[in-house]
Curated annotation (Swiss-Prot):
InterPro entries: NADH_DH_su5_C, NADHpl_OxRdtase_5_subgr, ND/Mrp_TM, NU5C-like, Proton_antipo_N. It comes from the Eukaryota. Signal peptide: none annotated. The keyword DNA-binding does not apply. This is NADH-ubiquinone oxidoreductase chain 5. PANTHER family: NADH-UBIQUINONE OXIDOREDUCTASE CHAIN 5 (PTHR42829:SF2).
Amino acid sequence: MYLSLLLLPMFGSAVTGLLGRKIGVTGAHIITCSCLITSAILAIVAFYEVGLCNSSVSINLISWIDSELMDVSWGFMFDSLTVSMLLPVLVVSSLVHIFSVDYMSADPHNQRFFAYLSMFTFFMLVLVTGDNYLIMFVGWEGIGISSYLLINFWFTRIQANKSAIKALVVNRVGDMFLSIGFFAIFFVFGNLDYSTVFSIAPFINETIITIIGLLLLLAAMGKSAQLGLHTWLPDPSMEGPTPVSALIHAATLVTAGVYLLLRSSPVIEYGPTTLIVITWVGALTAFFAASTGLLQNDLKRVIAYSTCSQMGYLFMACGLSQYNVALFHLVNHAFFKALLFLAAGAVLHATYDQQDQRRLGGLIGFLPFTYTAILIGSLSLIALPWLTGFYSKDLILEVAYGQYEFSGQVAYWLGTLSACLTAFYSLRLISLTFLTYPNASKSVYLHTHDAPTIVMIPLIILSLLAIFFGYVARDLFVGMGSDFLSPSLFTHPSHITLIEAEFGLPQIIKLLPAIGTLLGAGLALYLYHMLPVFTIDLTNSTLGQKLYRFFNGKYYVDVIYNHYIIYGGLQLGYVISKVLDRGIIELVGPYGLATGLTSGSKDIAKLDTGNLTSYALYLAIALVTLIMILLSPVLLNAALINAPLILVLLVAMVCIPYINSSSNDTVTTVQVKL
């Protein structure tokens, strides 16, 4: 069953990709959707057997690398962490496949799209089920190339090409640090198996553990779009098909970095410096992304920046050693983020791909079902009480404050402020898209229609999960005394603060995020729905324009990267190419050798003057040189006499050909004049 769960998506991808012309579009839909739905059902069964019944499964297929100390097998492990990751990955992926049947119905390349989508899911399954770091690396690189293919699915668009390359290159930075980290793990531990590495980690020097932890953190920052390596995230949401955005942002690519930290918890727990850095990175990313999303106008880009912000919350939880809370929020986030992106796709599908919120408005009467789906997803995103997001997002802030350390306090206040900003831009999105006066052209509203039944099914399922899953699964993931994740995640005893956060915090600290959320949501509705004149006046003011350009321009991070890093790198490459490749290497390489031999042969040819006295001089110089070589032991004692003589002879040898050549030219000139 467990291998079937893993291989079915790959089977669907291979059949659809290789036999797409034979089976047709309908066949591609049936095969890929059937494989994914079956895998999702098997994942639910595996969650019951492994997670609830506490019966972990390990499968060792064949040996892969057996070279002296290095022994790596194709092995897969199903523990509580693995099955918890399989649940959102396969449920969301199967719903995205169903949604794509209608969304991509007019595209002529359906078979290729569904093959890429299933391959993407397969590599994510490889990443989360592998029992060693090398198999994780296979899945890690696989989702990277799959995301490139999906973002660049409409490859005739230059912007899609550029976005795919940008995503691939930025992720290469994280991949480089991941490779170095795995080399460091093998060098220190002598093995890449999780069980071996985790059992030896407590006995390794803290400095070494910190270095390995920081390398893994930098790798996770690339995949999970943390501050500094976040620039690739909005582009796939803009240029790829919307189902791709839902899969990338909800369940696969961006969660891979968080999974790396969760799986490596037995290692990074022994590096306190690493944990502090992770906390700061997460807190700063959450605030940065939330403030950047405030004044974005593209519908999908706003949701994309909310993903970046929520990944910051997950990093905060990992840095605070609350890995079970991070996993709980990861699963919750997958459901309501997939709901938001698929509902946004339904809006785009109904409005002829109009993504600018300012050119929409008034859609609540035309798309009531889609409006309800986006409303549920947004309310769960802002952690409205008793929805799914509330049970995990607020808990992250509580455990941050409950640490009673400086990094925890900073994380709490930045996270609370980010929650206010998240509520603001979420309700701003709803207001501009659905509640304000219609701003689109009349032709758009004439043909606007709500989602068909095949699109409603995924939205209904995700809406129910966004409402009820947090309440149902809370005690299992983060309940007091729950040992559901204890076999998979490790928290050092000195870092256990969940009880203090639950019972020891002042009530105002617990209520403050909810109060800020309500204030942010109310302010957005007031400014954009009830009093838009004030917003227009603020935009026309000098201060308002500067603030708008700053936040809409994403803190000018792309400008800084382009001007100081990319442009500087291109200039450095030009200088290296000019001085080294086309300079020194050419000079000492084939070109320099050929040129030198040609020039030297011409200089030697000038010695053949045809003058008898020149030949006599050459013979005399050769004879003197031979005598000096033979008598060098004796003459070395008279260096002051020997050196000037040698210098005179060398100068004579060099100058004679040119003197002869000059005299010959003079004679020729005189003869011509006569």
